[in-house]
C-alpha cells in the first residue's frame, strides 16, 4: 500500500503545511486449509515527524530592545512492524486469530532554546529511543446472518502490554554566544519503555452487501506504562469511532456503481500529559472514497480520504 499525505497545522493563528509520501504496508494472506488462514507482512507502527519554532518576548535590555527567546521543537523517526498471524474458524459463525509482531526502530526528540541577546547561553535537550521488541495481538469475531439481506458482526481484540526491550538516551548541552560547548550531561536507561494493555470491541451491520455501519471502542492502559522509567507520565486513552460505507451496486458493471463512499467520526481522550495535566481531547471527522482499479470487480483499490482533527 502507498500513501500521499498533505497536512495543514494551525495554532494561535499560525499555520504550516507538511507533505509526505510513504509505502504504508506490504502484506499477503493465504488459506492453509478449509478452516485456517495465515497472514504476514510489514507495516509502520508509528511515525514521528515535526519541526516547530516558537518565539517569545520575555524582557527588554538596557537599550529598550526586546529580548526574545526562540524555542525549536523537533521530532523524527518511527517504529516498523513485521508480523505473522493465524486465523481459525472455530464454528461457522465464530473465528479467532492471533498476530505476533516484531517492533524495531528509533525515535528522536530535541528541544533547542536560544536568545537574541548575545550574552545569553543557549541549550539543547534531546532524547533518543531505540526499540527492538515484540507485540502480541489476539482477536475474535462472531458473524450472524439475519434473513437474506442483514448481517451483524461482533468483534473483540486484546493487545498484550509489557516492558519492551529498549534503550533510552537523555542529553542536555549548553552553548555560549560563540556556539562553544560549555556543559554536557547525559544518561542511558535500559528497558525504560512499555506497551499498554489494549482492549477493543466493535460491531458492524451490513445491509444487502451495500451499506455497512460500524462502531468501535478502544481502551489503552497508558497510565500503567513507563517513559524513561518514570510512571505517571500518561493517562488511559479512550477512543470511540463511528463510520459508514456505501456501495451503490455490489454487482455493478459501471465504474460509479462500484465506488465505495465512506464517512466517519471519532472522539478520543489524550494519553499524554502536559506539565502533569491531561492534554486536549481529540475530535475528528473524515470522508473518503474507494476507487476500483484494473477491474471493477477486482480487489485493488485507490483510497482517497480527507480528515479534520481538532
Model-derived regions: residue spans:
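Subset of outer-membrane beta-barrel
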Residues: 1-310
